[in-house]
Amino acid sequence: MPNRTPKQQPAPHAAKDAKDVERMRLEHDLITDSGIVPATKGRHAIYCLTVIGTIEGHSLAPDNQKSTKYEHVIPQLVDIEEDPAIEGLLVILNTVGGDVEAGLALAELISGVSKPSATLVLGGGHSIGLPLAVSARKSFIVPTATMTVHPVRHSGMVLGVPQTLRYFEQMQERIVSFVAGHSGISAKRFTQLMHNTGELVMDMGTVLGGEQAVEEGLIDAIGNLGDALRYLYAEIDAGKTGY
């Protein structure tokens, strides 16, 4: 019988290198396609979630607008809570607002994550972005960011009946209650900022800079990426040591 040369198996290190390359490619695609960083390569595994542009809910945003789709974010938050390898959550926001119910739904889920969490407002955290900004255990904002506080808006057909006005009031009450319950600002003060008529042209509301947002108690601290990560690392370390 002819001699058959046994098929050579790839060296273990070569297989490992191939897996590392594939993992890096998948991570790069995830960052490029959706702006998600599953876990950092630092001292602890921090999941970075971005909320940018318009928060898209039951209706699609126009094609020329960047958006964050809530049906994409919800499974990620479930995975963050379920995956034991993920130790913390960092939510980075630069949003103009969007669908009220979708924004509140995401804010409720973020507030329900049992792992250390932090939010960082860059650029803007406007409208329904406010509940998202205060939904984590600790909130940070850069000095140059702004936050717009205003009443609930609605586009499309509106029925001119008392029930419609009551619906808007109830939605606004839920927003005020959530923000006041997850930050240092009172419901009364938040409502005053929301109904301010002396700042915006032909509109109602208040624009807060980074330092103003902290002074009002809406955001916990002025800070940037390093500050948010240091907070998360400290919380994770404290949890592991039991302090």
Label for each model-derived stretch:
Residues 1-130, 135-150, 154-243:
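N-terminal organellar transit peptides
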